[in-house]
Amino acid sequence: MLRKTPFLDGRNPPLLVHCGYHKVGTVWFARILGRVGSRYGLKVQRGMRVRGNKVTPPLPDTGIFIDPHSRAEGNTLPPFKGSHMVRDPRDMVISGYFYHKWTTERWVRMPGRMDGKDWGRSDWRGWTYHDILNSVDQEEGLAIEIHRASAGVLHRINSWDYDDPRFHEMQYRNVIADEDAAFATMFTHYGFTPKAVERSVEMAREFSFKNVTKRDVGEKSRGKSHLRSGQPGEWSQYFTGEHRKLFEEINPGLMVKLGYEISADW
């Protein structure tokens, strides 16, 4: 008889929670967890932003809760097992810069959305973020993206509690380096049986970068794509000395805290 539940303790299954960030594999993980949820009868819910930095809570029948912006507060959730993934914030800046130059996401095309920002210019009042980035050269555009990201997603990354044992911490660079091992560890943390871990890793493999894009990691898309190159460390090809200085000034110690650098002098 086929065992439906993936959990070692099938009578007391925890809520599964995955927290990520924009441009840090949120679509990738949603596809994987959606497939796993479908296989094992676990309802998947995507957390939606509500007032301020809050997120909609999981419903009573939710089995897998995906928070794409890491706004969920662990102490407000029912008993859970979670995963949380970060990416080199500098690569997030590069990925975000190129993506925001062409995406049709509503906020990027909303006139005046960037009004009042301390890094903005008075003649940009009423402009869309898309138009701002496309009106300046790459060097200035990356500086703008550093400012914007630092006030939002990078602030949340810096504020995250990395010592919460309920969350399995993951780094994009390590997942890309060995996807099978990374996902096996994640599903084991979730409390899956060895067989369920094996099956879930097989499902995750279907959504690997190469299988989805038909490109190797590091090979850039020829056109507009949500998945650009996937190569860790790409920031070093684009950051100038001024970009490095600006990033560290706004986000002091973040790269050392996350383990990407050993000192602030990078």
Language model region names:
Residues 42-60, 162-237, 241, 245:
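The conserved 3'-phosphoadenosine-5'-phosphosulfate
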